[in-house]
Amino acid sequence: MAKTMIGVIGGSGLYEIDGLENATWQTVETPWGPPSDAILTGMLAGVPMAFLPRHGRGHVHTPSSVPYRANIDALKRLGVTDVISVSACGSFREDMAPGDFVILDQYIDRTFAREKSFFGPGCVGHVSVAHPTCPRLSGACESAARDAGITVHMGGTYLAMEGPQFSTVAESKLYREAFGCDVIGMTGMPEAKLAREAELCYASIAMITDYDSWHPHHGEVDISDIIATLSGNADKGRNMVRRLPALLGAERAPCPHGCDRALEFAILTAPDQRDPALVARLDAVAGRVLG
């Protein structure tokens, strides 16, 4: 049976977890360039962990400049099997209030300035992202959040915007009323798509910080309010993460939903027509099927 290794992508506060043993910052090189930062690895309750600050320590990357491909490749290269994404989001629903967590299960991708696939000319691949998150891993996150006393909502649709500016009132109302989205953020895509291409189980937790700009009784998004809410959410996030090793266990069976076999029939380019340079770059992401 395979071994579990949990990867967490999120803010800098998440990796300051009591009980993380043998903590070491590792620099990981990838064919897609450097990841956002070095990756903190260690053991938590007997399970290997890897923490990657999405924007880098000190928040140096914009949502558009985050090296999403390098981040996912680096985690896969380290042996991560299960990726937990944690990010700040605005809410389109009254009942999803600031301080609440939402376990996402769907996305609408409105980003336009990011590389969204590991594949390309010379090695064409098409994976299904009909269900972009892993129900097994999402269920574990829900249990961990409830055990930590967090108000958590299971299921929600995330509107991924390019940023870095926040929405206009008209955009906010469009996404809420016409699109039927539940939350909005700037970093959920293409991260979820790339995790699927890398055959990683992926769960995403939206930490609600505000009501975006649609709400008639709340003002426009204020970054100072977001930072204040994030401070409290970081404590909740750490309490959730520290419960995950016990829920997932050190031994890992194949994903019942097929996340770890997403590339089984996805690559269409004939073997004799594949670009050797691109195939070499895919060694960690798709080595299982490319040989």
PLM segments and residue spans:
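Metabolite-binding pocket within alpha/beta catalytic cores that recognizes anionic/polar moieties
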Residues: 1-131, 287-291
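Active-site/ligand-binding-proximal alpha/beta "capping" segment
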Residues: 144-182
